[in-house]
Every structure is written in structure tokens, then in C-alpha cells.
Amino acid sequence: IALHYAVQLTRVNWGHLSDKTQNRTQWIIFGMLFLGIGGILASISIPLIESRFAQGILLAVFSYSLIGFGVGAAGTPLLALLASYSSKSQKGFAASITFLMMILGLAITGITVGIILDPYSHQKLIQITSSLAAITNIISFLSLRNLEKSLQNSSYTPNGKAISSNVSFIEGVKKVWMEREARLFTIFIFISMGAFSMQDPILEPFAGEVFGFAVGESTKLDGFHKIGTLI
């Protein structure tokens, strides 16, 4: 669980690359594809660990790395796309809607998958993960199709200019870090995301070990937790 968060430290680099190319869509689709593949491989690694421990652990490490890269490659350019075509007065509202939709999606997915997953089997988990990967990638592709191009051709004016190809990643980070507001916001995000994600390694194992919840039941519990967060 910690690995895919650690890999997401590359988010800054994904944002830098999308700034330089000014084609956010390709990075979002690329990230979603990696995320889907990583999720499928992660579910496959579970039964493999039981039969071939070393190979299963290697596959799990690889798959969770893919998940981290996928989340970073899709999420950061998406937020950049949102910021580019939102006016200054709309940025906060647009970001709020985006994160509310994310939490709502997590809640619906957690409860739905929890219901379907009982009684648990490795094969059922792989089937559910594969189906979710296909559905989310199709929805993402259809949602983004021609969106950025239509915004570029419309009256919307992107906020900010493309980063010069001569500006390196390190130079870009240094320039941003020199801004006091950027530093304070980074600290705020660090604390808030730490609090939001802290339940991941605690809630579901605790429900299983202390209350004897099955896998599907603890997954539903996580979905209800997200509903509480949403409210």
C-alpha cells in the first residue's frame, strides 16, 4: 500500500511533462491504462503469493508501482487541465467538484464491489478488477475525447503559458518552491492527504481481525467510510 503512494512522488514530473507538451489528454489516458493494468496484476499476485511466494511478491511490487505511476500520470495532468481552462474565480469550485466526484466514485465502487465480492474467491477478485479496469478506461477515453481540442478551439483562453523546453524539471521545481504560497499549500496538502489516506492500512485489516469481517464486508465498510468523508 505504501509503495504506490511513494511512487506518486513522480506526480510533479508528470505535471511538468504535461506543461511542456500542452497535451494533457495523452498523459491522462496513458495513466489510466497503467492504473488498470496495475490493478489487474495486483489481483493476480494474491493467489501467486500463496503458491510461489517470491514470484508473487515481485509481481505485487511491480503492479503497485504501475498503480502509483498510473495515478500520478492521470491525476496531475487532469488537475492541470482543469486549472488551465478555469477562471480564477472558478478554480476552487472546479477543484471541489472534482474531488467530491472522486470520493463519490470511491464510495460507490467500494460498496458495489463489496456486495459482489461475497463470497470471496481469487478468481472473482480478478474478474471484478479486470471489469473495473475496462469500464474506467472506456469512460475516461469517451469523456476526454476531443475535449481538450474543443477547449483550445473555443473562446476559452488557457491560464498560463507552456513551459519552455529549455526549462529543466529541477529548475521548474525551484521556481515554484520560491513562492511562499506554493510552499504553504504543499504543507497543507501533505497533512490533509496523510490524514485522508491513513485509514487505508488500518480500517479494513482492523475490521477483519477484530470484528471478523469478510473481505467483501470490509470493502463495503471502506465505501461507507468514503460516504462519511463526502458528507
Regions found by a protein language model. Give the residues of each.
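Cytoplasmic helix-loop-helix junction between adjacent transmembrane helices
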Residues: 65-100
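Juxtamembrane intracellular "pre-TM" segments in multi-pass secondary transporters
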Residues: 151-186, 210
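Central cavity-lining transmembrane alpha-helices of secondary-active solute carriers
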Residues: 1-19, 37, 223-231
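C-terminal ends and interior cores of transmembrane alpha-helices
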Residues: 30-54
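Pair of pore-lining "gating" transmembrane helices in MFS-fold secondary transporters
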Residues: 1, 65, 177-199
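Short amphipathic helix-loop junctions that connect adjacent transmembrane helices
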Residues: 1, 201-220
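Symmetry-related core transmembrane helices of the 12-TM Major Facilitator Superfamily/SLC fold
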Residues: 124-143
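Glycine-rich segments within core transmembrane alpha-helices of 12-TM secondary carriers
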Residues: 4-11, 92-117
